[in-house]
Amino acid sequence: MTGSTIPGVAYGSVERHADERGSFRELWRRSRLPEPFVQANLSTSAEGVLRGLHLHRRQVDYWVVAGGHAFVALVDVRRLLDGSEPRPVVETRGLGPDDSVTIPVGVAHGFLAIEPLELLYLVTNEFDGSDELGFAWDDPAVGVPWPSVTVTADGRPILSDRDRSNPPLAELVARLRG
């Protein structure tokens, strides 16, 4: 695992053992990543799909790229939420097959599928709609430098209705601070 500018974020890669029969990958081992994961998910995304920016207050995520390439954006809003910093910390990175990232509570995350993508992710909580928060992927106050996509006429990503309607980060922060 390698470090990050964001505390608690760790990048790594899983080892692939391949021969003429195929390959084997160990995706997770408790001794290396002792988070109490309780649910595993597999997401598939077509080229040009953007998922995010999503935020959890009670869940750690561990992602492994099973196939394809993603542009990943992480936005640390913890110090913004507690009032100790005026801006979030933004970090981006490309992830390819077998790359992994651990995302702690309070770090928003999203990805753009640069090509067809399979993403395996383990989480520390079962799905809980009350912990499925999000803010606008293109919020200029956050400034994620998303690459343009070539699969749409306007160069913008393909979004879910939820991600298309997420509020600006300032609105989410105001709501969470209550």
Spell out what each predicted region is.
Residues 94-115:
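Conserved metal-binding segment of the jelly-roll/cupin
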Residues 1-97, 118-121, 125-130, 135-178:
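Non-catalytic, conserved peripheral segments adjacent to functional cores
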